[in-house]
Amino acid sequence: MRKHPGLSRRAMLKGSGAVLAGAAFSTRVMAAAPPAEPVTPTLIEAARKEGQVVYYTSTDLPVAEKLARAFEAKYPGITVRVERTGAERVFQRVGQEYSSNIHAVDVVNSSDAAHFIVWKRDGILTPYVPEEVARYYPDEHRDPDGQFASFRVWLSIIAYNTNLVKAEEAPKSFADLLDPKWKGKIVKAHPGYSGTIMTATYQMQRDLGWSFFEQLAKQNIMQVQSSTDPPKKLDLGERAVMADGNEYNIFQMKEASRPVEPVYATEGSPLIVGPNGIFKDCPHPNAARLFQSFALGREGQQLNIEIGGLRSVHAQAQEKAGRKPLKDIKTMKDDPAAVEREGESIKSRYIRIFRV
């Protein structure tokens, strides 16, 4: 990458001049997308000769490992080396490796869709369109040049502790969180620490206005860092309601009989997207293509849903019973380019409002 490893993520993204337009993470079309490719015996044999695929991901480790083991079971002779860390670290690691001409990773996943815009602009991703992506993915969830597609989708939601809040008294909207009865009872994550919450904060200030956050700040909220923290505080009963946080954590807790319940705000819930892509100079190109086809195919997507509590845009993936289908939920519109363009000002304004 033509970047300096010491630069911050946002400085690198701003310097890239990345541009998005309209769709979840559509980028300016620079070339025609390649034709869709099915999984063939020739590809499988070539992948087996390579013997390995290296996967950098920000997906929760148990979910990433389940995906890897399922792939290995389907394609014996090919191992998956999972390197899991946060999205920020994934981005920094790729930048450091490529600036040193080290090509160690095959397939990458990040919970920050804007990373893929940078990698694409730097010319280090390779086009590859799995057959199932071409057939079953909406246009807005695949790069028009075929360089990445939505591997996982989730929401940042409101939720409450069912031991502390009766269903009929629970908030139904973001506006409800401003009711004085919730003062001192709300937990919230920080956009300065969490990419998920930065994305959610951008969407919420765009749709609800900064006045919402100014009023929320008067509610004496518990401020935490990661998007995984509000569900934990909720589960422990340290707060009755969370204003934001990962939907998938709430699913996992609820299905483990923990006292939590999701709420889908009437104004819409922020939508978060985490794509997958393949690097052009990867060491195992055939194994990378086979793994990408598996991860983005129905089998990999169903595993994400069942094990990870995640959503999928694959048209044939089945929602898990007991969860509200994504198609029935009003969501806010994702715009990674705007998040990166306005990220520093969003963070600064948030800090001023909440004094944290």
Where are these regions (language model features)?
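Extracellular/periplasmic bilobal clamshell ligand-binding domains
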Residues: 320-356
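Periplasmic-binding protein-like
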Residues: 153-154, 182-192, 214-217, 223-224, 256-282, 295-318
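A ligand-binding cleft/hinge motif common to bilobed small-molecule-binding domains
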Residues: 114-118, 240-259
